[in-house]
């Protein structure tokens, strides 16, 4: 997983918003 600030990239739950598998 990578940090992603793009709301469209919010694919995985995590402790911070914007956690993405993109």
Swiss-Prot record:
GO terms for molecular function: lactoylglutathione lyase activity; metal ion binding. Pathway: Secondary metabolite metabolism; methylglyoxal degradation; (R)-lactate from methylglyoxal: step 1/2. The active site is at residue 12. The keyword Metal-binding applies. Its EC number is 4.4.1.5. It catalyses: (R)-S-lactoylglutathione = methylglyoxal + glutathione. Catalyzes the conversion of hemimercaptal, formed from methylglyoxal and glutathione, to S-lactoylglutathione. This is Putative lactoylglutathione lyase.
